[in-house]
């Protein structure tokens, strides 16, 4: 199980919890550990650290992260928050303050599509539905005037032209699940 902490001073960290509950710090210098996903076919791990305005990728081999590099930076269009991946290996990134979800080609760093929403703070997204072709999008009402954005805090469901993949389940002791 992988998780991170938050720190306004970029003093947070990113951890792995094994099946027995033992935590190992993988890296530090984290502001707000967000959007995590794996491309298991290519041994890649994607990571959003919201205040850095970027999505990074690591090589992921034998449970170890290495070779961190930046996929893209989102200056001026919102901060990357939650994230998921579709079956084509493209990333769908929620942009906090950006009124949208973007579909990102992680190999070129290009935004190849987007879904506009009527709320600023788009928090996360995940594929679901019978064939995983529906994108469920969470939003937040935190720091929002609900008179201006009455749908803030809502969950949206959008039919896409692609399919996502099932989520990974933690295989450890059920007390940690």
Where are these regions (language model features)?
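Beta-rich, blade/repeat-based domains predominating
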Residues: 1-5, 10-13, 23-45, 74-91, ...
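Flexible "stalk/tail and boundary" regions
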Residues: 16-19, 102-113, 126-129, 135, ...
């Amino acid at each position: 199980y992988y998780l991170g902490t938050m720190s306004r001073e970029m003093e947070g960290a990113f951890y792995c919890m094994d099946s027995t509950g033992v935590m190992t710090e993988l890296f530090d210098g984290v502001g707000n550990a967000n959007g995590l996903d794996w491309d298991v076919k290519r041994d890649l791990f994607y990571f959003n650290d919201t205040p850095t305005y970027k999505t990074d990728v690591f090589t992921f081999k034998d449970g170890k992260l290495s070779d961190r590099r930046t996929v893209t930076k989102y200056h001026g269009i919102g901060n990357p928050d939650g994230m998921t991946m579709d079956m084509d290996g493209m990333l769908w990134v929620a942009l906090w303050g950006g009124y949208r979800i973007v579909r990102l080609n992680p190999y070129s760093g290009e935004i190849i599509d987007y879904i506009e929403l009527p709320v600023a703070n788009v928090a996360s997204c995940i594929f679901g539905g019978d064939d995983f072709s529906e994108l469920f999008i969470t939003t937040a009402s935190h720091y929002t005037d609900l008179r201006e954005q009455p749908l803030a805090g809502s969950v949206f469901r959008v039919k896409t032209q692609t399919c996502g993949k099932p989520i990974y389940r933690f295989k450890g002791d059920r007390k940690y699940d």
